From Swiss-Prot:
Forms oligomers. It is found in: Cytoplasm, Nucleoid. NCBIfam families: division/cell wall cluster transcriptional repressor MraZ (TIGR00242). Its main location: cytoplasm. The gene is mraZ. It comes from Corynebacterium efficiens (strain DSM 44549 / YS-314 / AJ 12310 / JCM 11189 / NBRC 100395). It comes from the Bacteria. One of its GO terms (cellular component) is nucleoid. This is Transcriptional regulator MraZ.
Length: 143
């Protein structure tokens, strides 16, 4: 399970060190793809494969479904962390997420998200008020 917030730095070669506590779950490989809200999503390879099979089963008669599947698959980059736990983020991924040197990696239960640190701070400020309201609507009394 992926939980918590971490602040690794992106190096000049586009490499990002993943939090040590998650490396065991990612030794079988991982997939980096575009995420929501201009973040990057990092899935264990098996989790991404399961989600891809689910997406492939959706009818492609809908333009929205076709666009989603195309964007998801076209932006997917399969990787294995190196011995230091680093992954290399493509120029396209770094550009999409607006990544600078300062990054934030957050656990999203079954996958990770990579954010530019300033973008994450802004997102948190903008969504903080909705957090309490969302509990009842989205999670039915989780907290």
């Amino acid at each position: 399970m992926f939980l918590g917030t971490y602040t690794p730095k992106l190096d000049d070669k586009g490499r990002l060190t993943l939090p040590a506590k998650f490396r065991d779950e990612l030794t079988g490989g991982l997939v980096v793809t575009k995420g929501q809200d201009h973040s990057l999503a990092v899935y264990p390879k098996e989790e991404f494969a399961a989600r891809a099979r689910k997406a492939a089963a959706v009818s492609r008669t809908s333009p929205e479904a076709r666009a989603f599947i195309r964007n998801l698959a076209a932006s997917a980059d399969e990787q294995r962390p190196d011995a230091q736990g680093r992954i290399t983020l493509s120029v396209g991924h770094r550009s999409y997420a607006g990544l600078t040197r300062e990054c934030v990696v957050i656990g999203s239960v079954d996958f990770l998200e990579i954010w530019d640190a300033q973008a994450w701070a802004t997102y948190q400020e903008e969504t903080e008020a909705a957090f309490a309201a969302a509990e009842d609507d989205v999670l039915d009394g989780f907290l």
